[in-house]
Amino acid sequence: VNSAAPYFADPTTADPAGEGHVHDVLIVGGGPSGSSCAYWLAEAGWDVALVEKKVFPREKTCGDGLTPRSVRQLADMGIEDSLTGAHRYAGLRCHAFGKELNLPWPDHPSFPNYGYVITRHDLDALVNERAAKAGATVFQGTEALQPVLDPTVATPAGAGLPSCVGAVVKDKSTGATREIRARYVVVADGANSRFGRALGTSRDRSQPMGMALRGYYTSPGHDQPFIESHLDIRDSEGSVVPGYGWIFPLGDGRVNVGVGLLSTDRRWKGVNTGTLMEDFIAWAPKEWELSPATALGPATGGKLPMGLAVGPRLGATTLVVGDAAGTINPFNGEGIAYGYETGRLAAASLGEALSGDGYAALQRYEARLEDAYGLYYRVARAFIRV
């Protein structure tokens, strides 16, 4: 175990490991997948550098709900005990067409029977700090501008991405640029993944994609023991409109309220998510006391690539993880757990590669993804087309 003290590097200085140093792994992006990957690699003793363009804590658009699957990963990283300000909840309450169904989380041999609601503002800072405490060198406020490629390394069969040996990075506070080099590079820069696209990743447009919008509201239901999902939203005339809504209590006087819809709905291109949010707020159960007057600021949103719809995910020296690989669950829109898990799966393959297995170990990452999600995601993609 690497017991080095946390090191949040100053991006205006040379690499703390020395000029010309080559790290074992460079991770681009400090969200769930990147920080998870950094933690597991650093915990195993590898020399890891992580660059994150924002400075933690920072806002991040998300539903903020952690399922038992996420909690398991946080517990394995030793983080659950730090969730002191998070709201613990017991399950999901579903509303649809006048019916209500309470679904408590079941007892399970691998996962707890509870989840948490916590803002990504707080959560991502905790996980990133944990990676640093494990020994990862974290460069905050540092943007990866472009990959550094090695044209002398041939692209092996089955590797869809070129050989990447680092990144040109910029200190966003000064504008200074430099290179960070590594034997392997992990792309973990989220759903938009500019770094991944620069290497050649793209979304399979035949696969489903989601759109979502969320905002924070004050509510007397802020400490409810269930998160809520609303599977029918109606407009001002009472007609059902495409999309779904959620209300996730944060336990601190606030609730996270959002709407989403899938590209598999033939009407989705004509939907304005702002109008959809207004409709949902107007039709939400009255006990939540939601209205424009209780909003705590403007809603924010984004697009959600799902079901491993982004590729290639494998290069001669590169792996793509989390939202950058489109790992969001098509069934429920959950992304955090799959970010943690794919970061961990990538760390396992990279550890094997660094131990001598090289590219053969990287190929096992794809096999691990298939074992973990392949059949489930294929069923999910088929289901949401119905």
Feature annotation, model-predicted:
Residues 1-25, 40-44:
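Extreme N-terminal leader/targeting segments of oxidoreductases
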Residues 55-75:
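Conserved N-terminal glycine-rich FAD pyrophosphate-binding loop of Rossmann-like flavoproteins
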Residues 30-31:
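Glycine-rich Rossmann-fold phosphate-binding loop(s) that bind the pyrophosphate
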Residues 71, 76-125:
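A conserved beta-strand/loop capping segment in the N-terminal third of enzymes
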Residues 348-386:
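C-terminal helical "tail/cap" subdomain of flavin- and related membrane-associated enzymes
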Residues 130-288, 292:
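Predominantly flavin-linked oxidoreductase catalytic cores and closely associated redox partners
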Residues 265-350:
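FAD/FMN-dependent oxidoreductases across multiple families
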Residues 42-62:
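Glycine-rich FAD pyrophosphate-binding loop
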